[in-house]
């Protein structure tokens, strides 16, 4: 939002913005670009602090353990001004500045490590023009993660410069003119040409996420340690599934089914005995399901925001959710929204439709809400929805299907149904820490086959939405970087 404000205040489009960031700021910008896929012109990252040097052995696991036992505490930074720059004036300024604190909250440091590892490992999702400047004598951060990050970038325009003798404060070094010259040259190249748009047309066939999906679909090497571990987990789940309500439901309907999702939303451990409830609690507290519940919160926030926006513009608020599951999150978000005149929930599953109709009746919403069976990938069905929706919701659907052609068909149908000025709310899954585990252990709603997912980068998902005729205007993401919820406006073609 700050970059959007800065662009607006400068009276330029977002596509004219180049962001320059150093150290921890560079990590923040790399994370922002990865998670939100802003349509800026490019970025310059200077000595990104992807891995801070901790000179005490086992410092990081020790801090993590102590944080778990003790809670929040602060540690004093070892960094002195003389480790940052050769510029004596800046060293003195650093040492005497009362606004610079040596105390660092342990959760901030640990989160910096976790986020950096995620962004470096998945840097292939970043396709913007990028320049990376690395200080040659950096006593504060490690160099190898910076190089790994750069090598994984997929921008057709990227360049790396190593500055010999430079300390960590690259842009505050004594010979910083060298760094600024390289930045000026790179930025001039960006503005000398049209803003580059990465081509995502074949991402589902030739991109790195497609390669990973195919590898996961093939399964691990037979009788390898990983394969044996997954076999053990599957047997354990069958054993515990008799006692854990969540595991039993997942194995019966698919862990990606609407019924499983609704159970996760409720977040109430259930089982045939105390042991079963204990197992169920562990299951519900997995990072993926915590992310799902945060996604529900973000969905409801943006649904309410969209309703308020449409109402303020004097437009009728007619809602459709094309793959609603049981519809709990939509109905809970809209039950107290009098501006909404019509709610249509759809799903492919007869079970979900029946459960959803019960929820509508329980909430006393039968006068303006209905639930019907329908195909979310049939553009002919979607384009003829009546009445024409002004707010369409697609949650948790596209993430389950690796091919983009189905997604394009669905979005094309919605684009025909929604009039200009209408709103689309859609979800994404740009990254997941448990892809391998899920593919090896859990089953899907597709006839009990392994639940293998292809992650779509946020930039890829936004590209599909934009090509269909929508302009993204806002987004939310959970603290783990797994699930996104975005809002886009139907543009007038």
Which residues fall in each region the model found?
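Short alpha-helix in the alpha/beta-hydrolase fold that links the catalytic acid
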Residues: 128, 142-151
């Amino acid at each position: 939002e700050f970059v959007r404000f800065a662009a607006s205040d400068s009276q330029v489009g977002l596509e004219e913005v180049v962001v320059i960031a150093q150290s921890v700021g560079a990590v923040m910008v790399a994370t922002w670009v990865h998670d939100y896929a802003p349509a800026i012109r490019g970025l310059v990252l200077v000595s990104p602090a992807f891995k801070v040097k901790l000179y005490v052995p086992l410092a990081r696991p020790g801090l993590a353990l102590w944080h778990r036992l003790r809670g929040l505490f602060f540690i004093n930074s070892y960094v002195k001004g003389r480790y940052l720059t050769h510029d004596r004036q800046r060293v003195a300024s650093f040492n005497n500045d009362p606004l610079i604190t040596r105390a660092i909250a342990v959760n901030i440091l640990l989160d910096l490590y976790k986020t950096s590892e995620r962004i470096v490992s998945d840097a292939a999702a970043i396709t913007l023009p990028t320049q990376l400047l690395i200080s040659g004598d950096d006593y504060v951060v490690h160099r190898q993660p910076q190089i790994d990050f750069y090598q994984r970038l997929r921008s057709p325009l990227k360049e790396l410069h190593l500055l010999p003798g430079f300390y960590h404060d690259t842009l505050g070094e004594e010979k910083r003119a060298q760094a600024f010259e390289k930045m000026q040259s790179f930025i001039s190249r960006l503005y000398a040409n049209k803003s580059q748009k990465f081509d995502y047309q074949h991402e589902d066939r030739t991109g790195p996420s497609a390669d990973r999906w195919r590898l996961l679909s093939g399964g691990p090497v037979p009788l390898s340690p990983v394969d044996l571990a997954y076999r053990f987990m599957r047997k354990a789940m069958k054993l515990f599934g008799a006692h854990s309500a969540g595991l039993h439901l997942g194995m019966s309907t698919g862990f990606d089914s609407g019924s499983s999702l609704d159970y996760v939303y409720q977040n109430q451990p259930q089982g045939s005995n105390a042991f079963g409830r204990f197992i169920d609690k562990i299951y519900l507290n997995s990072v993926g399901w915590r992310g799902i519940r945060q996604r529900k919160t973000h969905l409801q926030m943006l649904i309410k925001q969209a309703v308020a926006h449409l109402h303020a513009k004097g437009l009728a608020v007619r809602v459709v959710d094309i793959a609603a599951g049981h519809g709990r999150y939509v109905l809970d978000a809209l039950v107290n929204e009098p501006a909404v005149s019509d709610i249509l929930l759809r799903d492919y599953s007869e079970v979900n439709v029946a459960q959803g109709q019960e929820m509508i009746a329980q909430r006393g919403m039968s006068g303006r809400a209905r639930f019907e069976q329908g195909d979310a990938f049939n553009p002919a069905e979607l384009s003829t929805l009546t009445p024409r929706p002004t707010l369409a919701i697609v949650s948790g659907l596209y993430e389950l299907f690796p091919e983009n052609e189905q997604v394009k068909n669905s979005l094309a149908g919605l684009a025909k149904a929604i009039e200009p000025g209408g709103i689309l709310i859609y979800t994404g899954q740009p990254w997941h820490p448990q892809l391998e585990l899920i593919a090896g252990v859990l089953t899907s709603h597709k006839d009990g086959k392994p639940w293998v997912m292809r992650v779509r980068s946020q930039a890829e998902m936004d590209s599909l939405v934009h090509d269909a005729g929508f302009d993204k205007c806002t987004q939310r993401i959970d603290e783990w970087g797994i699930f996104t919820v975005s809002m886009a406006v139907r543009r007038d073609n």
